[in-house]
């Protein structure tokens, strides 16, 4: 905007203030009693009107500098300017990224790296916890099933508190929630290293660290899915390999570390490493994406016109010309800014309006949308996750005890877990590239992998020596990698709920998994305690995967409407029409009832 009609126009960022007739923007710098450091910059290119705003002291200093021929100092040379630049840069780093469409890159690559290390210090540690099982049984003199409850409670809290994680992320942002989760994880693991009873670990690792795992993992994978569209499958699959590399590295490393410093100090060391999750959470910048059919100009002008209409409600005259044709607004031209002026303000403050407009809509959005439970396709997919969780954690926990029970050396048994992790890496990456192809229906690929995973779980019960377990571990790792890296991002696909409901659907989906997460490892441990055979633990995993395959096969038919009655579409259309009528503001429109009645009489007259 120009000052006194002089000088070239300069685009500036600022806060918007609105009065009855115009929209002005003020400088976002701190208030100063007399013009501030801007008065030291010399002649203002926007004219003398700006110079008169400076105080007499600073204005006199500026005149004296021009009299002696000295150039005014740069803003960077003053301490006040440096502090303002630091504050500006910090606000820029904390500001949300605004895109007109899904970027498929940009800052999303930093988010992908953060998700990789979050996977390392969350699920990587959970899957590597099996190396402590024999030490905990000897130290606490407890049975296998009671030790299994540590991970069971942890997984239960991780999944049960998923809706809470979604609500907190929508309320306070993903970054703050993930950083708080990293602190809780480290606190619980460090506290567990001083435990004297097994139930102490139920609270420290099970409850405290389990809550931290939920706060760290779910918001990270949710915001990563928002940064990518076409590359979502491959990026998520590659980033999720962090847990695989963690298992490959941590299993032999922790085993060797225990021999030198004991299991307690090893657990303390792991807890300190998990503080890095707070660094990963600091990189999660929020993202705002406009509607797919809106141009920047349309998104910018619409909120401004809406505010203008609200401020000038008494000066606006509207009427309903016809019941069938909808609502027609008739507004006085003097109350609407000119098109040239509107475009001029649009170009100058496009970024500020794009940032503030979505926030206005987000304030009205629910913190947790339970409407996903009305979709039968989501219910079937949630049941798939419920039964599949039985087979996710137990094999990694019992593969080392199974190898030791068959007479395999403990070091070679730990190598089985590392081999499983490496195979999982290739499974995740391969699934990412396969699912990234457009013609492929992704949910069918996942169904095939679930069936093959069920077969691999049954194969563990027939292995009797090292190479048989090695073959089963490779096959199981590759299949669980394809499922583990895609089952949550699959919610963003149109076959389930779509990207719009991804955040709420992920919270509800993981919450439903909590039941099997609590019952899975203890059920496997109970079978081991009764039979004294570790291979029996894989029967419950295989049975759960069979039921998961059946539920997953029903997702696509439910989405296509084959499982719905014929009247569901009509009822949904009626509800949408009723909602559209309720959204019309009553105090905004002044209905011309006389005009409507006149047209109604005209229609009733015979021709």
UniProtKB/Swiss-Prot annotation:
GO terms for cellular component: basolateral plasma membrane. Belongs to the major facilitator superfamily. Monocarboxylate porter (TC 2.A.1.13) family. Residues 1-84 are annotated as: Disordered. The modification Phosphoserine is found at residues 319, 322, 325, 332. This is Monocarboxylate transporter 7. InterPro entries: MCT7 (IPR030766), MFS (IPR011701), MFS_dom (IPR020846), MFS_trans_sf (IPR036259), Proton-linked_MCT (IPR050327). Forms functional complexes with BSG/CD147 or EMB/GP70 ancillary proteins. GO terms for molecular function: taurine transmembrane transporter activity. Its main location: membrane. Residues 127-146, 197-202, 255-268, 405-414, 464-465, 529-536 are extracellular. It is a multi-pass membrane protein. The keyword Transport applies. Pfam families: MFS_1. Residues 1-105, 168-175, 224-233, 290-383, 436-442, 487-507, 558-607 are cytoplasmic. The keyword Membrane applies. The chain crosses the membrane at residues 106-126, 147-167, 176-196, 203-223, 234-254, 269-289, 384-404, 415-435, 443-463, 466-486, 508-528, 537-557. Signal peptide: none annotated. Keywords: Cell membrane, Membrane, Phosphoprotein, Transmembrane, Transmembrane helix, Transport. Monocarboxylate transporter selective for taurine. May associate with BSG/CD147 or EMB/GP70 ancillary proteins to mediate facilitative efflux or influx of taurine across the plasma membrane. The transport is pH- and sodium-independent. Rather low-affinity, is likely effective for taurine transport in tissues where taurine is present at high concentrations. Gene3D superfamilies: MFS general substrate transporter like domains.
